[in-house]
Amino acid sequence: MRALLSRVTSASVSVAGEVVGALDGPGLLVLLGVHAGDGAEQVATVVRKVAELRVLRAEQSVAGTGCGVLVVSQFTLCGDTSRGRRPSWSAAARPELARPLVDAVVAGLRDRGVPVTTGVFGADMTVASVGDGPFTVLVQA
């Protein structure tokens, strides 16, 4: 599982021109890719890292500040570009396996009291964000 965390001052995700999830203040935009073979252990690691990493201003975490998280599923994070000119997506989990794990990450963050908003799994989405820093870090579980 890969989670690309970007510190933002605001972010939103739209489907067919309609905003379906947004952060109106500071927080984290989390692009989440699920690999084939991922499970509960990877979910727990990503939830812990997203909630507890001190990546916000003043070395704060989202769990410690109440800042929100916008989670957007993105299978392309599992792409392999090591050969040729076209990425391979073979490492990505199939949608029927990935969706419950994305939902589990969202539920795990909410269980920790983190305000979470999301995109729509599998939809063609437009993601907008205003980066803060910029500060982006990759979590691999």
Model-found features: residue ranges?
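An anionic oxygen-ligand recognition environment, strongly enriched in 2H phosphoesterase
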Residues: 91
